[in-house]
Amino acid sequence: MYKRQIYAITFFVIFFWAAYEQSGASLTFFADEQTDRNILGWEMPASYFQSFNPIFIVLLVPVFNILWDFLRRHGKEPAATMKQAIGLALLGVGYLVIAFGVDNLDPAVKVSIMWLTTLYFMQTLGELCLEPIGLSIVNRLSPARFSSLLMGVWCLSSAAANKLAGVLSGLYPADGKITSFLGYQIADLSDFFMIFVWMSFAAAIVLALLSKRLEKLM
C-alpha cells in the first residue's frame, strides 16, 4: 500500500520541478534578454539570479519552522500532502505574476527586475512547502529494507521533471517564433509563462482533492 502513496506524490512533484527548473533555461534567457538588470549604474549579470533561491532559502527556513510549529500547536497545521499542494499553488502564483508583468510586452522593452525576483521568491516558498515534506513522507512510509530504493524513486521524479523542463523550455518564444503545446499556441512570453501557471494550479487542485484520501492511507 505504501508504494501507491509514494508513487502518487512522486508523480505530482514532477510538475513542480518541471516549472521550477526553468530557472536554468528559459528564465535565464528572460533575465538576459528582457530584464532591466541595471542597479544604480551597475548591470547585474543574468547568472546572478541563480543565487536568489539559496539566499531566500536561508532567510525563510527559520520562518517556516516557526510557522509550522505555531500551526501545529494550535491544531491548524495542514496535512503533509496539502502542504505539497500549497507549494504547487505558490509556484503557480509566481508564474502568474510574471505572466501578468510581460503581457503585451514589446520584444525590445525590458521589464523591472522585481518581476523575476518575485517569481524566484514564490518558487522558494513553494519549494519549502514541497521538497522537505516529500522527503519526509518517503522516509516515513518506506520499510527499512526498501528505503534506499524508494528514495531513488523520489529522485527519479527529478530526472523526469528535468526532461519535461527541457521540452517546455524549448517552447520559449525567442525571435518572435510561434510554438504550440498540446494545441495551446505560444505567441509571446505571457503565453509561455501561462503554461506553468495552468500546470502548477492543475496539479495543486488535484493533489488537494486527493489529500484526505492519501493521508488516510498513510
Protein language model features and the residues they cover:
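Short, small-residue-biased leader/transition segments that mark boundaries at the very start
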Residues: 1-2
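Juxtamembrane inter-helical linkers in multi-pass membrane proteins
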Residues: 33-39
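Intrinsic disorder in cytosolic terminal tails and internal cytosolic loops
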Residues: 214-218
